[in-house]
Amino acid sequence: MAREFKRSDRVAQEIQKEIAVILQREVKDPRIGMVTVSDVEVSSDLSYAKIFVTFLFDHDETAIEQGMKGLEKASPYIRSLLGKAMRLRIVPEIRFIYDQSLVEGMRMSNLVTNVVREDEKKHVEESN
């Protein structure tokens, strides 16, 4: 019987939890602010990890840029803390990527909501 998850998937889940804790408790850079780790992708040999993040204030482009610069600057420190927290032979090289899927999802949801409202208005006007 085949295993349900690959090891890289399990490691990615654990990295996501650990990095979320590290960002919340250990990293004190004011540029980073309120950041959420939305997903982690780990290479099959566990040497690289892409960490997808979102920020609380997604509408402010400069805050996002500053937050990403802060994360990039802190990545060696975060990697060292990750190595201490996890028992891995090789701690993956981490790269932070801004996750726009949440913002795009909200934009699409707003578009659908607006279309539904306009459609309801047309039906109300037609019935009168």
UniProtKB/Swiss-Prot annotation:
- Tell me what this protein is called: Ribosome-binding factor A
Q: Which family does it belong to?
A: Belongs to the RbfA family.
Q: Under the cellular component aspect of Gene Ontology, which terms does the record hold?
A: cytosol
In terms of InterPro entries, this protein maps to: KH_dom-like_a/b, RbfA, RbfA_dom_sf, Ribosome-bd_factorA_CS
Molecular functions (GO terms): ribosomal small subunit binding
Name the source's superkingdom: Bacteria
PROSITE patterns noted in UniProt: RBFA (PS01319)
Write the record's keywords in alphabetical order, separated by commas: Cytoplasm, Ribosome biogenesis
Protein task: One of several proteins that assist in the late maturation steps of the functional core of the 30S ribosomal subunit. Associates with free 30S ribosomal subunits (but not with 30S subunits that are part of 70S ribosomes or polysomes). Required for efficient processing of 16S rRNA. May interact with the 5'-terminal helix region of 16S rRNA.
- Organism whose genome encodes this protein: Haemophilus influenzae (strain PittEE)
Cross-referenced PANTHER family: RIBOSOME-BINDING FACTOR A, CHLOROPLASTIC-RELATED (PTHR33515:SF1)
Quaternary structure and interacting proteins, as annotated? Monomer. Binds 30S ribosomal subunits, but not 50S ribosomal subunits or 70S ribosomes.
Gene Ontology BP term (one): maturation of SSU-rRNA
Record localization: Cytoplasm
